[in-house]
Amino acid sequence: MRFFFIFLFLSSVSTFQSQVLFVSFKDSKTNEPIPNVQCKIGFSSNALGASKDSLSGFSLQNGEIYFALTTAQTGLTTAKGTIEFQLHYSHPIYQSASKFYAFELKEDTTKLNLYLKAERIQEVRDIIIKSNKPDTVYASKTYSVADFELGANGALFLLTYEKNLMKDAQLQCIYKDTTLFLQQIPERAEALRRDFRGNVHVQTETSMYGLQSTDATLQLRSIPKDYFYKYIAPIVDTSLTRQFYSSYIDIYPAFEYGALDQLDSTYKAILHIQDDLMMELYRSEYKWVDIRTKLWAKNLENQTGIDAEIYVGANVFTKSLYYEPVYAPLFLSNDTLYIFDYPKDMLRVYTTDGRLLKSIPIFHHYHAKQSGFQKNLQQDRKTGKIYTIYEQEGHVYVGLLDLKTGLVVQKVKLAFRYVEKVRIYDNQVYFVYRPFESTQKKFLYKQKLPVRDN
């Protein structure tokens, strides 16, 4: 809960007075809003409580909690005409307190800014690996590595270029130091994308190119880009009998995870993800656009039934500096689903049939400006371990997550600064690197991680 509003409507025998109390919680050092603070306001004769995840008789709307009181109970106001109340607030990693406040019913709005001090910050000791340089996986005097992916059988897929990625990109497939495939991409290449089956595709402006095995030879085939993102990309992972879907699109701050049973074709929703603050800003953009844009959005609403605020948010607010796509990745490990619900500060653990096992509070993403936390969780597909990436002053740190506690149990600092395209496979970190101010092509390196049971 970044902000909450308390509307107090007090009535007396002869007059009716209203008062708005605006309370915000911020970090005392960074001045950033603190999400998911649990609050309770108490009067002498009644008490109101609310938290972001558990509400009792109160409405949670767009990241704000509204209390509505209409009461003539005695004890709410003093003889001086002031209202007195006790405010209790708590947070797992910030100081908790219970304070007494009193204010007069003269102004329409009273602002109360509370600055909390972090009391429980997770400290992880960096693990310094041997000073030897990482091993070189791919080096060429002709080609630079723009992107790469690792296949399940150990095959290495490289998107390389000689001078310009947009003009002379090639897809290479290397297995056990042998180049199995090398072919020019006929369109402007953008990046490599892996699908739920582990197949690697080259993303271009209009198509997705992938390798197809025909008569023991590899051939480059293409499918329409819109087909890939409509029917293939939504499948996040699969178990023996289920496919796990995501309705995520980067221009909407909410989506849903669900599972499709391949035996009886039944679909079950697993978890709805939403960034409440971003959703409120997203929808409120409609209030500030010009009349022409509002009419355009209303016409679309009449045609499709989709709210006009969503059309404006998707086409206007997502292009602003304030919009951040919601981040809440799902991973399948040992027949268990792990959903990192960052908007709610929770790690949700599910069975593959969609039954919630537990919710674990997580805070390793807090103070991102100081810690360098990147929205880039990765799973080692060989070991099943999940890692989070941090970046500070050009140095990249790889943090191992404990799936039982949600804590980062170790951090490993990579040997080089300003590395690109970090991937983790078989307990090793792969990355693209070129020395600063060097004429060397971009090479692919790997650095071994310390072995630790998770």
Feature-to-residue mapping (PLM):
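A short, solvent-exposed loop/turn motif at the edges and junctions
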Residues: 79-101
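Short, ordered, surface-exposed loop/turn motifs in non-cytosolic proteins
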Residues: 29-46
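Structural motif
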Residues: 164-172, 207-213, 250-261, 290-294, ...
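Beta-strand-rich domains and repeat architectures in extracellular enzymes and scaffolds
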Residues: 134-170, 184-191, 322-337
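Conserved blade-ending motifs and adjacent loop-strand segments that build the rim/top face
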Residues: 183-190, 226-230, 361-374, 405-425
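Short, acidic Ser/Thr/Gly-rich low-complexity loop/linker segments typical of extracellular
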Residues: 47-71
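Short, acidic, small-residue-rich periplasmic hinge/interaction motif at the N-terminus
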Residues: 92, 115-137, 143
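A short, amphipathic beta-strand motif
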Residues: 21-27, 114, 127-129
